[in-house]
């Protein structure tokens, strides 16, 4: 299939490996586009041009566009830089005022940061001429893209794009008073209802995505089932159960090039399924590095995770 006839997919997210990585989202954003391209899609990434990237990758970018968008009652600058890296095209949204410091500012400042990003994504794609068939939105920071497309950009060339919203973690939803969404993006107050964006005491990026995205997905089939239960839905069980037929649980894959024990430069001894002797030696080296006593036959268990209750730390004894 030629690229001209390929399914055009634009993946939007706050972080992407190897450029900026604070969590598992970055791994998905950094590997999924390449895999999609290998099966015939034309998949590209759009993300903020964080200050952490500019020193190492800034010289490799090509300027594609600059324009102003309507944001928070005024006109706000957007620059678009293009980076081709590891066979994938990346579009980087540049604005020092929003992406010149922390990737996630926290609180109201983070809401403003990513409300800006959501509008910038839509207008940038249109202005540079990459009109996707599908916009793949990841986590709450991109959650306003579907509602903006549906309610404010229907007359634009990008207005017919379908959206899929992937839930990486239900716990974080981008909750703010609806007046902020109205101020930032001019979202109509009629959407400040439980049917649309409102959930209990506030509105949220996440609720908007759950209602307005054409399809929903999660990081595993099990998680897709779990989040319909009030214990794991974080007060979104109503809409998640209503949209169960539109929700797909797709198991996150593993980057077998990076995480390959036969070639991984970060482990002292290599091994494979036919010869596990190197794995035993790696275990001994790890025990030494941790200052633990070496006791044959006793397993050592490691967790690569945030130190939060949600990750099951209570199960580690």
Regions found by a protein language model. Give the residues of each.
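Catalytic cores of nucleotide-sugar-dependent glycosyltransferases that transfer UDP/GDP/TDP-activated
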Residues: 1-317
């Amino acid at each position: 299939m030629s690229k001209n006839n390929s399914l055009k997919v634009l993946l939007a997210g706050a972080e992407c490996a190897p450029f900026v990585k604070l969590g598992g989202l970055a791994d998905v954003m950094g590997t999924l586009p390449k895999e999609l391209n290998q099966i015939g899609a034309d998949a590209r990434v759009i993300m903020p041009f964080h200050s952490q990237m500019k020193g190492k990758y800034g010289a490799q970018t090509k300027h594609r566009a600059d324009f102003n968008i309507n944001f928070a009652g005024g006109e706000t600058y957007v620059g678009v830089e293009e980076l081709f890296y590891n066979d994938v095209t990346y579009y980087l949204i540049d604005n020092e005022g929003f992406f010149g410091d922390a990737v996630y500012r926290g609180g109201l400042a983070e809401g403003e940061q990513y409300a800006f990003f959501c509008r910038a994504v839509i207008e940038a794609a249109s202005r540079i001429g990459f009109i996707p068939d599908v916009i793949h939105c990841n986590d709450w920071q991109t959650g306003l893209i579907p509602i903006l497309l549906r309610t404010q950009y229907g007359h634009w060339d990008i207005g017919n794009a379908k959206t899929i919203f992937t839930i990486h973690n239900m716990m974080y939803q981008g909750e703010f008073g609806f007046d902020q969404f109205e101020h930032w993006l001019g979202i109509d107050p009629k959407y400040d209802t439980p049917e649309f964006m409102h959930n209990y005491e506030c509105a949220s990026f996440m609720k908007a995505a759950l209602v307005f995205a054409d399809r929903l997905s999660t990081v595993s089939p099990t998680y897709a089932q779990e989040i319909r239960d009030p214990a794991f839905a974080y007060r979104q069980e109503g809409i998640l159960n209503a949209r169960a037929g539109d929700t797909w649980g797709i198991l996150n894959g593993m980057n077998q090039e990076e995480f390959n024990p036969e070639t991984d430069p970060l482990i002292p001894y290599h091994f494979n399924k036919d010869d596990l002797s190197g794995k035993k030696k790696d275990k001994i080296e790890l025990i030494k590095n941790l200052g633990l006593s070496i006791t044959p036959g006793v397993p050592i268990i490691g967790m690569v995770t945030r130190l939060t209750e949600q990750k099951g730390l209570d199960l580690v004894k």
